[in-house]
Amino acid sequence: MSPKMVAPPTNLHFVLFPLMAQGHLVPMVDIARILAQRGATVTIITTPYHANRVRPVISRAIATNLKIQLLELQLRSTEAGLPEGCESFDQLPSFEYWKNISTAIDLLQQPAEDLLRELSPPPDCIISDFLFPWTTDVARRLNIPRLVFNGPGCFYLLCIHVAITSNILGENEPVSSNTERVVLPGLPDRIEVTKLQIVGSSRPANVDEMGSWLRAVEAEKASFGIVVNTFEELEPEYVEEYKTVKDKKMWCIGPVSLCNKTGPDLAERGNKAAITEHNCLKWLDERKLGSVLYVCLGSLARISAAQAIELGLGLESINRPFIWCVRNETDELKTWFLDGFEERVRDRGLIVHGWAPQVLILSHPTIGGFLTHCGWNSTIESITAGVPMITWPFFADQFLNEAFIVEVLKIGVRIGVERACLFGEEDKVGVLVKKEDVKKAVECLMDEDEDGDQRRKRVIELAKMAKIAMAEGGSSYENVSSLIRDVTETVRAPH
């Protein structure tokens, strides 16, 4: 990295295109605020449904004189074969609609370009999700740079790169090899996974999915650079190696969640929480330091009623306080809660029916463990809070993130899931985790033995590094300065 320089306030205008999924939208809004705090004008373009999700956060930012605006584009859902009104990945009936929402995203290209041409001041730079490949073409026509936002960290991104370039994901292998464990070659650590865990699916990618992915990869190659929500001290060897293999500008500017400093911002990131900040903190304040297990399986993962009941029975058996965020409740599960479970755990279990204020909860000193689906936002938020994890991956990047948590960082314990469960397949998959598995993993993570102490020490040290990285003079702070300088030089350069 170049010598530390204080970047002067910028007057650049960044336009951000987040993917229509909670886990991609939330960090993009954080990035918008980080850039606006440096003086930039930022426009976020998304669908009405997602604009409504983040409007309170943006309104608070505007009230502090940050130059951020939300503009809406209507997703042509029915034209793309989606159910009417479906604007988000978490609204999809099943993963099989992935192709349709990709089509709907492609249909945004022309109206988005028309909107960009009308903006005043005109845009200087586009930052868009990896899965918006057409923004590279739009940026080229507007003669401005496009930066790619990659949701996961560099460990995952490098693993995928290695898997593709070494032909581990090639089509010439017998189908049975999908479940055989393979070692990813050339990595700083020995990482052994199955092919299906690499792609994070219950089946190999089909032609359409691979086509979409490769189109996004080609668009990334033609982009100006890559923005990653990580910090260099978390995964230094993977950051350096990924920069090398991509041979492209890259800025690690995370953990972006640390831009949330006030109670309302911590409590309302994305969807409105189903519990108030006051009630949540009051409950936590009454517990012992490091005693509470937080359980949340993300914004997209779904589990069957039978699996949820098994998880609940496991939580009941651990005899520790817990907060359980429960989403997508079926009638069967609602009945089970009312038939005695909530009453039995009332003194030590807080059930949040809906969205939980995750960063607020994780940053509370009474939280001693996090049972997580291993989405990257949850992973880095837990690290930032200094909380060790129990890993329960479902799909996408989550199995590789689990390997990073358990094998590379050594700050987590596996619950023991080996196969993916795509949303929409939860009833077919059934119960993968028994109540005994829950109890065993919690005891392993939170007991006061030497392994547990070492995990806690490691994650607390990483949390300190995260905060230093985001503070003035830290690596991520300097990388934001570098990003602004690089874009400024490109925009000002004669064409």
UniProtKB/Swiss-Prot annotation:
Keywords on record: Glycosyltransferase, Transferase
E.C. number: 2.4.1.-
One of the Pfam families matching this protein, by short name: UDPGT
InterPro entries named among the record's database cross-references: UDP_glucos_trans, UDP_glycos_trans_CS
PROSITE patterns on file: UDPGT (PS00375)
Ligand binding (UDP-alpha-D-glucose): 299, 355-356, 373-381, 395-398
UniProt superkingdom: Eukaryota
MF GO annotations: UDP-glucosyltransferase activity
UniProt similarity note: Belongs to the UDP-glycosyltransferase family.
Role played: May glycosylate diterpenes or flavonols in leaves.
Name this protein carries in UniProt: UDP-glycosyltransferase 73E1
Organism annotation: Stevia rebaudiana
